[in-house]
Amino acid sequence: MEAAAAAPRRPQLLIVLVAAATLLPGAKALQCFCHLCTKDNFTCETDGLCFVSVTETTDKVIHNSMCIAEIDLIPRDRPFVCAPSSKTGAVTTTYCCNQDHCNKIELPTTGPFSEKQSAGLGPVELAAVIAGPVCFVCIALMLMVYICHNRTVIHHRVPNEEDPSLDRPFISEGTTLKDLIYDMTTSGSGSGLPLLVQRTIARTIVLQESIGKGRFGEVWRGKWRGEEVAVKIFSSREERSWFREAEIYQTVMLRHENILGFIAADNKDNGTWTQLWLVSDYHEHGSLFDYLNRYTVTVEGMIKLALSTASGLAHLHMEIVGTQGKPAIAHRDLKSKNILVKKNGTCCIADLGLAVRHDSATDTIDIAPNHRVGTKRYMAPEVLDDSINMKHFESFKRADIYAMGLVFWEIARRCSIGGIHEDYQLPYYDLVPSDPSVEEMRKVVCEQKLRPNIPNRWQSCEALRVMAKIMRECWYANGAARLTALRIKKTLSQLSQQEGIKM
């Protein structure tokens, strides 16, 4: 049986060499065995190949030996006549060669031939041959999806308790995040925790639940040694934003009660791709946008939200001169979604991925090579009409002030006096669509010089009157005429004292 299977394969392997040899110029005529050439001593001559075949039918075996002329070798590299064939009721095995009498051989046969053997594949067999590989591929794909899903579930699962074996020995048992931050701020560095400590914290955090998504990726609530933290997970295409935000957060002397507390930054391999983590303090109220959508605020609540926002921005904008000094920083994407509300009702500024720092010694601005732009709805007039001086750092600070004026308008609308308040709305909600273009905002803000409407009822409350006055002075078309963050902070501090509010 094995010899029979091998014989048909040998001519296929040698055909090219055989055909080439017979076509060489000057080659003599090839003598072959011919079973019909009785007059010529069973010999024939040819310029082509010697041929031998055996045909098996249901009742007999037919042998055939002869010469094949060169003209019949079609195609020349793999002649049809030399190929084995199978028809209903018969199977033919062939062999071609190019040496004298090389076809004087007996080709092996498979024995008695049955009709069933030659019939080829039936419909059931054909279906099985086709369905088999398809099922195998489907099962393989399902297995891959299952494995990937399990990896994700394992990575994001919520264990009953954290594995203490994951902690590294240099963070002693019982140490809290407050202890680590306190040690960092009193050690004199003021530029964030050591990288090894950051990595240790990040890699021993247990993710609990997803609490938000954005263009950068998503935010998770996590736990480290029982303390809740926020984990901002950037997608790999947002690596520049992750690196920039981590870099800004670790600026010397940046830590402030009204700026989101940075804990750690790390890149983690979750088994299928690399995640970029930024770990910070967790604030259960979420963003100011979410908070104002859910709740109205009292006069005291309004002042606390506004004053803490102004305090955070004033600290960002301020340059601290000294050995451990801090450069002035402009946010460039200030809005209610990038401000978080703390448990005590005050705010902290977050999302510093677009921030720029000013080096007063060289008067240069380190504008990050980042493809993102600020939020169009909150862009200042000079940003919308492209007249902003990108080489002048004060220009960026003034654009922040304009945006903060819009945030104050959002807060003041939710201030309830005598049960009266406005529904929450985004600035310019009545003038532009939900996702306005730069051109639509430029037409409203720069050409028509429109600003958010200030309700008449605000004039009946001193606190709302002060807030309205601050807003108008933040919205001037001329950036140089706008208030500074420090001036706004002082005005609101005086207002809080008048209202008897303790911050």
From Swiss-Prot:
EC number of this enzyme: 2.7.11.30
Subcellular localization: Cell membrane; Cell junction, Tight junction; Membrane raft; Cell surface
Annotated membrane topology: Single-pass type I membrane protein
Domain GS stretches: 175-204
The keyword Amino-acid biosynthesis appears for this protein: no
Protein kinase domain ranges (all copies): 205-495
Subunit structure of this chain's protein: Homodimer; in the endoplasmic reticulum but also at the cell membrane. Heterohexamer; TGFB1, TGFB2 and TGFB3 homodimeric ligands assemble a functional receptor composed of two TGFBR1 and TGFBR2 heterodimers to form a ligand-receptor heterohexamer. The respective affinity of TGBRB1 and TGFBR2 for the ligands may modulate the kinetics of assembly of the receptor and may explain the different biological activities of TGFB1, TGFB2 and TGFB3.
The protein's name in its UniProt record: TGF-beta receptor type-1
Organism: Mus musculus (Mouse)
Taxon lineage: Eukaryota, Metazoa, Chordata, Craniata, Vertebrata
